[in-house]
């Protein structure tokens, strides 16, 4: 099956990036948010990112206009998905929220429509069970910033069909992404490796081993990381990091995945990183 029209559920950081790459590659996109102000904000972010691409001569002005004209915004999930070939959900890492959304999507989307989640850690099989089409359900984990990062983790659930997998793999390549197949385990590959490293870096601060800037300097200068783990945590969002650590901890029942108490306190205090202007570092 060829994917000609997509619905993206959620216009936040990941959702607007996913919308951007589909629209820029000639695929019509229905983007839904909870209200029109948030939908307009997502569209504005996409336009700003396209403007940067025009300035850097990666695309021309006509391509920018064509991309924006390929996007239609909605505030009703049911209206968004009624005529699409693929739905990509990109809401926060909360199982109950995703389950509720996919129950609505499953009822409203055409029978042929593939349902994909951008979850970075939650079981694909578990979310798929909330629908009547687990064979058409799959994980499609993009990376931030979506227009730049080339990787997509493709995650089959217990009942995902080979046809569904092949369609999503082909679609990922059409988006100029590299699809990597991974099994349905908590955190998949990316976050199972990355998040414990970030969590351990937070423990270094929590236990007084080193200051945040020094922890990051060690990893950048000594391990050739382009960005330190604490700066990266701020960029991702400390709330997101905590959600993923909780999924790992609950999924594996292994104390090595226990979230650092400092991470929990910072999230409770609303210091979430870039998005709030303060995390391990301060931002304008």
Residue ranges and their predicted role:
Residues 23-26, 66-86, 167, 172-176, ...:
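Amphipathic alpha-helical segments at domain termini/boundaries
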Residues 25-27, 82, 145-154, 226-227, ...:
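Acidic/polar active-site rim loop that often engages polyanionic ligands
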Residues 114-184, 188-192:
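Rossmann-fold dinucleotide-binding core
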């Amino acid at each position: 099956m060829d994917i000609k029209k997509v619905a993206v559920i959620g216009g936040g950081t990941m959702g607007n990036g996913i919308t951007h790459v589909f629209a820029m590659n000639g695929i019509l996109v229905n983007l839904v948010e909870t209200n029109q102000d948030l939908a307009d904000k997502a569209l504005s972010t996409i336009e700003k990112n396209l403007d940067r691409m025009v300035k850097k001569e990666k695309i021309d002005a006509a391509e920018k206009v064509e991309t924006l004209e390929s996007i239609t915004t909605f505030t009703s999930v049911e209206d968004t998905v009624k005529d699409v070939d693929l739905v990509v959900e990109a809401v926060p890492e909360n199982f109950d929220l995703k389950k509720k959304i996919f129950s609505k999507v499953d009822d409203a989307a055409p029978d042929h429509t593939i349902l994909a989640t951008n979850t970075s850690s939650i079981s694909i099989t578990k979310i798929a069970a909330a629908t009547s089409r687990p064979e058409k359900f799959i994980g499609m984990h993009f990376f931030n910033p979506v227009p730049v990062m080339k990787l997509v983790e493709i995650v089959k659930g217990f009942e995902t069909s080979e046809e569904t997998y092949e369609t999503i793999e082909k679609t990922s390549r059409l988006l100029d992404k590299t699809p990597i197949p991974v099994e349905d385990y908590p955190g998949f590959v990316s976050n199972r490796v990355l998040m414990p490293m970030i969590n351990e870096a937070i423990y270094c601060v929590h236990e007084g081993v080193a200051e945040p800037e020094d922890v990051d300097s060690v990893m950048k200068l000594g391990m050739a990381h382009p960005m330190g783990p604490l700066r990266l945590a701020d960029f991702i969002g400390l709330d997101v990091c905590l959600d993923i650590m909780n999924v790992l901890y609950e999924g594996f029942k292994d104390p090595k995945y226990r979230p650092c108490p400092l991470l929990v306190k910072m999230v409770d205090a609303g210091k979430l990183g870039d998005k709030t202007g303060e995390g391990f570092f301060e931002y304008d």
